[in-house]
Amino acid sequence: MRRPPPLGPTTASGPEGNVRNLRKRQAPGPGAAGGCGPEAGGRGENRQKRRMVARATPGRGEVKSDKSVAASGAGKAARRRVEGRRGQVSPSDRRGLEAAKEAEFPLQTERHTKEKRKVTEASSDDPQPGFDLVRKESLTSSESFQTVECLRSLGKEGIVEGIKRRIRNKKLKSLENPPLKITENEATQNIKVEFQDELYKNTLKYSCNILSPEVENNFVFKLRDCNCFPHSKDCNDENNLPYEPDGGCMHVAENFSKKENFRSLAEKSDTNNIPQLLQTEENVMGVNKLLPEESDLYQSKINGLLPCLQREKNKYSIEESSVGRKPRKRMKLSEKADETVTQMNFSNEYNKSELMLQENQMIADGKEAEAKSPLNVLRKVSHNTVSLMDHLLSVPEMVEKETSSEHHVNAVFQKTIEPLLKEETENASEPLGYENMALKEDFKSKSCIGKSPEYHIERRSSREDLRSDSEELKLSCQRTIPMTGKRTWPYYSCARISAWCWKKASLPESSYFLPGSQKSCKKVDVPKHQTNKTHLTDSKLLLQSSLTETNTESSSKEKLDSNLNCLFSVSAVEHTLMVIKEPIIKDDKKIKSEELSRSGSEVISNTTEDTQLTSDTQSLTGNKKRDRGNLTKLNLTAASKDGQEANNSTGKTIHRKACVAKQTFVVPDLVKILNTGRLTNFKIPLLKNKTKKRKEVNAKSSEREGYSPLELLDNLSGADTRQNRSKENVSMTMLGPQTLSIQNSVTPVQASSDSFYNKNSCSISPSFTKHGNSSKPSNHFSEPGNIVSNKEVASLTVENNAFSCDPGYVEKSPSFCCNKQETFRPVSSEVRGRKITKNFSEVGFPDILKAYEDDVLLIDVIQDDPDLFGVSNEGELSFTSEVPRISQEPNVPGEHQSTDSKYVETPVKKEPSDDLRELPVLDCGPIKPDICASNSAASEIKHDPKDANTSLGEVANETSENETLGDFSEQIKGSDLDEKHRFTDKVITKEEKENIYEVRKSKDSRNADIMVGECQFAAPVPKPLCLLVPPLNLSGHQEDTILNTWMNDFRFLGKHSVLKLQNPETCEIFKREKNVGVFQKSLGLMIPYKYCKFHFNTLRGCERPLCKFAHVPEQGDEKVCMDVFKKYININELCLLQRAVNVFMEYYRKFPPGIYFDLQVLNDLLNSLLKHCLLKEVFQIVNLSIMVKMLPSLKILLNIFEHVATMKLRNAVPALIDIFCKLVEAGMVLDPEHFNYIVKLLYQVQASKQEITAVLEMKSRLQMRQFKKNWKCDLDSALNKLEHCKEKGDWTKLGKLYINVKMGCEKFADFQTFCACIAETLTKNCEDERPDTPFCEFAETVSKDPQNSKVDKGVLGRIGISAMYFYHKLLQWSKGRKVLDKLYELKIHFASLKGLIGPEKLASRCQIVNVAAEIFLKSGSLDGALWVMRESEWIIDTPLWPCDRLDVLNRHNLLCTIAHETLAKSLYRQTFEVLQNLPGFQNSQETVEVSQYSLLFNKLLGSCIESNSLGMSSSVAEFMISKSIPIDFSFLRRLITSLGRSRLWLKARAHYKSALSLGCYPPLEGNLYRKLLLIPSYLSEIEMLLAIEIFMVSNASSIQSPGTSTQILQIVLKRCEDNQSRSNDDYQAAVERLIMAARISDPKLFVKHMTVNVNKEQVYSLEHCSALKWLKENMKWAGKVWLFSNH
């Protein structure tokens, strides 16, 4: 394989060059390099294929993201080559690697500066703790950078021209987009800028030419093979690729130097995708060579850590046997390296962590004997982490944003952590110390800060690399041993090891810091190592805080610190994201960081980090199991070991898990986005072709990753987003405002990560569960937080890396769990899942069921085993102790099922499930969740059927809850404290226990796999599946662990699994049902198919959020309800009784009781509820039973009162009294002693007086009702008594008889008959001699009844009408008057009633009123007659009350009679009222002629005028004029004169005007306008004045116009023709009246006598001045009155 000329160490200046020399001298050992074993050849072929593919697809390199992807792919290819040559690395390769590393540092620096420019969010002032010394020097030395750049560019010349064109295009693009901001020191920034410029130029020139096709192929292969791919992406150095063959070293370099290079070269990698990747590989190789000692030390440390972890595993897990050899090898290596590690603590530690990660990747890829080695496992984990990083990096913008934010966070974190790092360095193991030193140096040097942008760039590239690595990891995460033909998985296998646990841990924390961490990740290409350190520091801080919480601060801190060192090394892969996120997250800040991590950038970085941690954690799990005392420390160490060497600190792992959880929220989205595009190619190959498929997948993944993250986002956002649902993508996008690229990529990544996450969570969960159970489930569950941390950690890790979660490890560290609890937030482990999903989708999957069929390891667990269910090290109740079946029993296959069902019923679990809604896992359906589920299921089974089951169900659920990580502590508390919602020991029935126990004992691995798979499948389902487990009492961490289960078992193969689900949702439901069937024991009910058998026929019920089967019986299936109630009552479990209440309420609210309704079942149900103190449910059922008229027994009512009295439930008394009253009203019969007993109980409860009075009132009413029922309404006997009363004339007794009959008669018809008999008795055969009126006595007796009602009044009124008619007929006016008076007294409105018997029964209302009025008139009561008329509203004939003409005539005569009587009494108003209501005035339809009433009205008018009742006279006149009733003009004139004299001028003028219209006065004709007024001499002065006013107003214009003063207004006092016989005295009086009229006027008018005309009529003139003055003062009103008509 041709590789470009080595750059040589001279390119680097200062300590950088020295470090490189050291690396050269220290040739990577077989552990560092990592032998590929049998797969080496295959990988080589794959690399060649990949080269060909990369050549064929130059378009991918056109995008920056593609470049980064290509770079990562190249890095992977190089690593693969190196791994293939493990132990066969040639000196030239080493030199190439060394040169590549040397060149990589400056490139990274330059890239870092460029990245800083682009990412304004990242601040140069923020210290980057993860930077290496070499990196710092490279940053400070601009010349060395340039030299390295040139060398790299020379190395790039070997690339194919096609690649060159792509690189050039990319380069141009990158050049077009210069860095936006340089945050580092000016000097460093300038150097970086210059270096970048040179790099760009060189890249343009040499990028395509330097690299040979062979190198290109290697690049592609390396992308598949190693996690370096992300780094190579960042570096995009062609030189790195040729030196990539040293996979182990490269991988370490990748983590360390590549990170730097990635940062500095991220942009270059965009322009020079493949060449830069090659350079990255070379740089990595170079770095490995330069730091061979460090790498060796690192590997040895890792080896030491691994053995320790393995020893722990041997103690606590059964898996140790399969991995025993590997731990031993690692122990040897670690022992050898421990001595050197002390010296090289800082750099070596970091390198070692990277080496371990690389080795883990190599192991995953090779899956051979070497793969079995712990170092290989760690390396594999690192690879996986890098792959995740590659994925993250594939989205450049996202990465940049994430990097910037992360960088900032790192700075803050460094500041805060620096003292802690110091302490940790002292307390921690050498690896930890090394990392702490690195962190310190990073904090101290500003150049490190300058490198932080590089670190961010590196992170971008590492993300892309992570993509390719994740694909490889998918292969590598597959069983390491299966490659050898064995079915069992080693401890270090991702499937067995919950490598994802650390991922979860870091994910939560990093999630909190996601925005910043993403940015920092981008910056951390070189600072990745630093970032890892920082992460370790963060983890350390988190661990410390958690230790403080767990009261094991001192000891745990030291252990955690040491462990944290390992974690930090591992976190090197994870980068600053986790570290930064963790420090920020810590406790309260962690939540915020989680939210930030959700933005997507942190998620990405967390995913990478988490993956590494997971791998280490897995390897550590076994050792943790060995020593409980060391469990916490070992677990922490395992976590750190997964991240770095897995030896240092479980506490770190915890922190990382928290960070991972945080990151997971965002990362799943990004992963989902990135993975979405590859989901279509997601296939699961058979195990047999595992190696080949891996290679193919690696080649494909490298090609795929060749695309830039942006391209992936663009291409995948459409299809993947559509497939994986834009919901999660949207959420991730919202979280990712920090970086646009992250936001964009988040959508596809989320989609893909959802499906993958679901799958991964299942697979990881098993491994985690297994380890956790073996190690110490009690620790895992020791605290709600601890328990959660174990499982959640795994699940979180799954989200980020799907390979780096170690459930066992997580469980081992209770302190870690505590920290993790704090750390865990709604971190989207699904983000990790998403990223992993993308990688997995690129890789094929083997036949899961077959693969795991023989590999399943069933562990017989004692339910009361203190190790599994005991108290945590912290001394707190283990989470499992409160919810053993939920957390730990789920660890068993049966437990998983129980967990699955439990989560639904557990409200706390449901709360996490709410968060799960956001998890991509829910959206995993389109991603072939069946495959993921099956893989995860198999993995879980392998790890430990118990743990696997728990992790399967719980992982999915916990993963969902991880979304709710922020609330996981509360959820845990709720689960621990809320017995109702949690399936506590009390709630869990014996049947459940037996089921769980049976499941644990189950040795059928196939069944276990199926169950796990089903659970996993359920998890992928968008809503129901994911929610299946989360509702369990599992804490947020446990939920994360569940997600990790997916990752653990998940295989990174691009092919679909053999189990292809046509409908993922259906398959998931089916499998879930199958699982439930296995785990839950049927209650023995025969439930129709259409109803959910889990809801009705299991103790825990249905856990599906959305169940396609009915949970409430339909109409007609009442028998099913009764059967269910009977069964639930017999079992007498609280949960079942509550479910029975729900079913009862839901069914009988919709449907009435039918023939199958059993009242005894209702009573039994109420009794059972009372026994369980479910008083609220009792009230609900009783109220509903009253509504449906199915009353419970009296005994139940008394029992309720007794319960309330016994429990002193004073607040329940009002509701109970209300129910009691309803029951009595509904027909419940109580004896007096029952009432007395109830009152006694109420006194015991200190009920209020009103409440007791209410009971007593109900007693009286009940007695009356009982009397009614006891009274036999014998009509004959009643009638006999009635006759007896009639004979004796005892009308009072008759009234009592009426009351009794009324109370006892059940038929209203009989009652009416009896009333009619009473009416006849009261009206007939009444002797005239007797003055009394029977009706009055009878009515008096009835009215005295206290229960007298309107009905009684109506009956009395009708009987009174009959009596009235009787007396009217007999002309017995006095008796009739008495009847009417009694009705009036009783306020009975008989006018609207009819009689009971005789003609009055059909009489009209008018007739009844006429009869009554006539009786009053005949009896001399005019007021009575008027009262009757008024009560009847003077109604005569209306449509509602029709009557015949005879009734109308009778009314007319009656009213006229009344009018005469009133008028005779001078009752003018009453008379006028009567006349107004004569027939013909009320209804226009009446045909009565009203003119016939003229005499009556004129008589009334005359009477009024005579009596000087001017008001009434005026009203009568107006009414007559309005109704056109002829009016007597004499009366009208008299009225006008009287009004005028009374100074009532308005009415006088109105009537005068009306009189003119009626012709009362001669017409004025045209004289008015001729200035001549003719006034009859018979007019009164008032009438004359009114005539003069009209005259003046009519001539007002003439009078008021100037020049008309000479005009004369003449008034002629006209003699009447009929007045000729009159004497002259009358005429002379008229003259005087005229003069008086002029004087009456206001102002006065002056009339002058002018002459006498021929007719001897006096002619007068109206003085002009007086008329003008009058008009001025009165013209306004006069004009309106006289000029305008009123009508």
From Swiss-Prot:
Positions of region (Disordered): 1-131, 319-339, 596-632, 880-916
Keyword flag Iron-sulfur: no
Alphabetical keyword list: Cytoplasm, Differentiation, Spermatogenesis
Biological processes, Gene Ontology terms: cell differentiation; spermatocyte division
Residue spans of biased composition, Polar residues class: 598-622
Superkingdom field: Eukaryota
Function summary: Important for normal spermatogenesis and male fertility. Specifically required for progression to the post-meiotic stages of spermatocyte development. Seems to be necessary for normal expression levels of a number of testis-expressed gene transcripts, although its role in this process is unclear.
Species of provenance: Macaca fascicularis
Subcellular location: Cytoplasm, Cytosol
Single GO cellular component term: cytosol
Protein known as: Protein TOPAZ1
Keyword Cytoplasm among UniProt keywords: yes
Basic and acidic residues bias (residue ranges): 80-113, 897-916
Residue spans of biased composition, Gly residues class: 31-41
InterPro entries assigned: TOPAZ1, TOPAZ1_dom
